[in-house]
Swiss-Prot record:
Belongs to the Casparian strip membrane proteins (CASP) family. It is found in: Cell membrane. GO terms for cellular component: plasma membrane. The chain crosses the membrane at residues 11-31, 65-85, 102-122, 149-169. Residues 32-64, 123-148 are extracellular. It comes from the Eukaryota. NCBIfam families: A_tha_TIGR01569. This is CASP-like protein 2U8. Its main location: membrane. Residues 1-10, 86-101, 170-297 are cytoplasmic. Homodimer and heterodimers.
């Protein structure tokens, strides 16, 4: 369990950082509030009118989106942490689990990282408009300086959470790409070995059949694979020698069993000779013959 934790420690720490940073940005945005006073010039009034307003995240739709995105990222990071800790304590070989779980983690991490990046970009734009203003938007930070200062901290935390989420997504994509590469390499290697084996079998099976006809009941050294050319250090050749021997043995047995044996041959039985008793029953006695030939009195 400790070895698995050491291997996945970076991923766990990044998920933990993304969760805490996004949660902190969410709490700061939701709890941030300030009451401000500003003057309004009314036509016909000699003095401006003071108005009171409360700044919070519900006044701007962009802040609502920012708070919702930070909540989603924090919840997703907590869910992934729970799954990772459960796999560690259960002794699973990998935090990502199988291929399906790896794909789900990859898609979820990419979605969370892009959502966090979009929320951070929206918050940065709102902070710039609040500080600098626009032709149709006044700089509200002159009236709500404390609110803008605290919101700037939330923007920084959002960008840090985005960085952690992007690193998590990159690690997930690396694991997924590594698994896919290993699977493709294994398939390619298996295809190459099968092709070599098929070519060798086409050349070796006739020799085995011929030798099986000549030496049905004698054991001989298995033939070397044709592609080895006498090299005994080839790993593939060494692994295939036992396969050639087993193949020769099975083919020899098949050839031996295919030939009809004396027991299996159907020999017609010899013609039956009548016994002495049967002969006596068939041949009439002399007295009976005489009685049959004597005329009636």
């Amino acid at each position: 369990m400790l070895e698995l934790y050491e291997k996945r420690r970076a991923l766990l720490l990044l998920r933990l950082a993304a969760m805490f940073l996004s949660l902190a940005a969410l709490l700061i945005t939701v709890l941030n509030r300030e009451d401000g006073f500003f003057s309004i010039n009314v036509f016909g009034s000699p003095q401006p009118i003071l108005a009171k307003a409360t700044a919070d995240f519900t006044l701007v739709k962009g802040l609502k989106f920012f708070a919702g995105a930070m909540g989603i990222v924090a919840g997703y990071s907590f869910l992934q942490l729970a799954i990772a800790m459960a796999s560690i304590f259960s002794g699973a070989p990998s935090i990502l689990g199988g291929k399906r779980m790896a794909w789900l983690c990859f898609v979820g991490d990419m979605t969370a990282s892009h959502l966090c990046a979009a929320a951070a970009a929206v918050s940065a734009q709102l902070a710039y408009l609040g500080k600098r203003g626009a032709p149709m938007w006044s700089a509200v930070c002159t009236y709500f300086s404390h609110y803008c200062l605290v919101f700037g901290l939330a923007v920084i935390l959002a960008f840090l959470a985005t960085l952690a989420a992007l690193l998590v997504a990159s690690i997930s994509s690396y694991h997924l790409a590594y698994d896919v590469f290993c699977a493709l390499y294994a398939m390619y290697k298996e295809l190459v070995v099968d092709e070599v084996c098929s070519r060798s079998m086409k050349k070796t099976i006739p020799r085995i059949i011929k030798s099986g006809h000549q030496q049905r009941h004698h054991h001989r050294k298995p033939p070397l694979a044709p592609h080895c050319h006498g090299a005994t250090s080839c790993k593939l050749c060494i692994l295939q020698q036992q396969q050639w021997a087993d193949l020769e043995l099975h083919l020899s047995r098949a050839i031996t069993l295919s030939a009809p044996s004396a027991v299996e041959m159907k020999i017609p039985p010899p013609p039956s000779v009548p016994s002495v008793v049967e002969m006596e029953m068939e041949i009439p006695s002399v007295s009976r013959v005489l009685e049959m030939e004597t005329p009636c009195k």
